[in-house]
């Protein structure tokens, strides 16, 4: 089933790419359709479109819907509470007060106070797409999201703004989408606390826009942010660039994709903290060749105090790949009831050399150490995604699969390891994943997969037990010792005897639920040279602008 689903999805994306390429090459007027939007074009330089990113846009529509519905309920509840106070002050009858006693009753029975139209007006919201290009994303938001009052589709290039205006008029959403020419940072700085949703989808890093975005978004507003600079965020070739852009140094590791997401979240949190604002990650994903996060901004300075304890360093062994987290702060109950004491954390969690293999550690971070996702938000998104029309949302099955993976991740366990990689340290064949997971579960530890990598494992088991599991496995599945260098990390680990009792008895819950549900969980590369596209016509557009 998994292979069939992946084949169908790959074929669909490949067809979309081929169709688009053929249309571009024909020289005649053509159009592309994605979701509810239609983008006409007659010149390939007019449009910057990557069909592989349809998943990004489908997912974003789903996420904003989940956020807006939750927001609407809170706004209606507050409105109801105000009506109750007014009713009490006006000495209305007890019958009316009882009738409107709860938000549920208010929504169902108090249409004389707040009908559906006025409720929608109360819960309406604004969106800024700061780097709009063709306006495709803004048009989809206007046509597919309820209660959107206004969308500002901004771009710096004159030709891009003209294209946005043409596409907006073609899709009949000019009453909602307003094309705008301007610098993204300037637009956000001129409108502090103004936009309820800000979408940043730059070509490369979003770092230059974070400071303005955390100020421009409204209280409890939503930031939807993409970064495609994976070589910086997820590699080890540019740790100095990662540090200057995101405030933390990157490491070469098997968990590099989650590391990248946590670097981005840390950068957003650090930017917001300067203005007395805190972040609440709702959904944070490593997807294909980019990273996409949905973060709610909380205007509560008291929450900013938690950032120290939510930040961490990571110690990563250069030999065996084991790792340990070092929080930068800690919290404890204060002297008075309901208060919290904030203090520095103690450390380090490791010695200079790895206790398992003797190799040195490399240090990465700081990074975000809190949860990547919000459980209630994921539940809401999954419910919405189930009802999506697959004809409109072509990546529906993958959305469901990605959300299922995120939902089952251990929320309090940063980072993962890859079973085949740690087995390669010992020159051992890998045990079946369900058998390895069963051994961890039988010992009382918690285990999950990760959305970021297909064969990743997250667990609260200590590394000493992980190596004991593999040493016990090797007893029945011997390795060729002549293939292991005596100075290697693997030799040092195998020299030790297991100290824990390991039970490999199979457990049904060792199969992750997301796999059983049969969703499309991990995307295979559907086309050649798959990844972020170059900016077509950038030089032509720049030349046109210079001549105008």
Swiss-Prot record:
Residues the record lists as binding Zn(2+): 317, 320, 354, 357
GO biological process, alphabetically ordered: tRNA N2-guanine methylation; tRNA processing
Catalytic reactions on record: guanosine(26) in tRNA + 2 S-adenosyl-L-methionine = N(2)-dimethylguanosine(26) in tRNA + 2 S-adenosyl-L-homocysteine + 2 H(+)
Residues at which S-adenosyl-L-methionine binds: 57, 137, 155, 186
An example Gene Ontology CC term for this record: mitochondrion
Enzyme Commission code(s) on record: 2.1.1.216
Pfam families in the cross-refs: TRM
Ranges annotated as spanning the membrane: none
Residue ranges of domain Trm1 methyltransferase in the record: 30-470
Position of the signal peptide: none
One Gene Ontology term of the molecular function aspect: tRNA (guanine(26)-N2)-dimethyltransferase activity
Keywords in alphabetical order: Cytoplasm, Metal-binding, Methyltransferase, Mitochondrion, Nucleus, RNA-binding, S-adenosyl-L-methionine, Transferase, Transit peptide, tRNA processing, tRNA-binding, Zinc
Region described as Disordered: spans on this chain: 523-548
Matches recorded under InterPro entries: SAM-dependent_MTases_sf, Trm1, tRNA_met_Trm1_C
Top EC class for this record: transferase
Function, as annotated: Dimethylates a single guanine residue at position 26 of nuclear- and mitochondrial-encoded tRNAs using S-adenosyl-L-methionine as donor of the methyl groups. Also has tRNA strand annealing and dissociation activity independently of its tRNA guanine-dimethyltransferase activity.
Family: Belongs to the class I-like SAM-binding methyltransferase superfamily. Trm1 family.
PANTHER family assigned to the protein according to its UniProt record, in alphabetical order: N 2 ,N 2 -DIMETHYLGUANOSINE TRNA METHYLTRANSFERASE, TRNA (GUANINE(26)-N(2))-DIMETHYLTRANSFERASE
Protein's recorded name: tRNA (guanine(26)-N(2))-dimethyltransferase
